[in-house]
């Protein structure tokens, strides 16, 4: 488990516990990619950052996951998340930025974690109405 803090109002929130950071990162990315086809992965991952790297930029620089048209190559032996974990070990991630809308969808899809997701959402103190593309800045600390 990890201690989670959310950046809000110029400071880090109180810690939120009860959720593994690797699970949060993988679930957030999977839930976003689930809504679209893998061909649209670059657009779908806009707003996601891991350890201050935009996920889309990091993968673009690597070059071997995309074909010459910029379309994601489906490698049969490894999933997108396994590929990402090889490039950025998710267990070592200290910061994660993700769209708030993705976390709201996750809250409705996973009733067993809805209370923890709601704590994270509430800690953001996001403006209402929330602007399109609004992202959470999350910091992880080991428990």
Regions found by a protein language model. Name each.
Residues 1-143:
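Acidic (Asp/Glu-rich) sequence patches and key acidic residues
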């Amino acid at each position: 488990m990890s201690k989670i803090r959310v950046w809000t109002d110029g400071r880090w929130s109180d810690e939120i516990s009860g959720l593994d950071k690797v699970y949060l990162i993988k679930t957030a990315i999977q839930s976003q990619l689930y809504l679209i086809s893998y061909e649209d992965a670059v657009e779908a991952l806009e707003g996601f950052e891991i350890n201050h790297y935009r996920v889309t930029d990091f993968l673009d620089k690597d070059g071997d996951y995309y074909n010459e048209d910029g379309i994601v190559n489906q490698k049969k032996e490894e999933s997108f998340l396994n590929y990402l974990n090889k490039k950025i070990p998710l267990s070592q991630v200290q910061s994660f930025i993700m769209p708030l809308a993705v976390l709201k969808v996750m809250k409705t899809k996973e009733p067993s974690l809805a209370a923890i997701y709601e704590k994270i959402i509430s800690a953001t103190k996001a403006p209402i109405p929330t602007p399109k593309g609004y992202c959470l800045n999350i910091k992880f600390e080991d428990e």
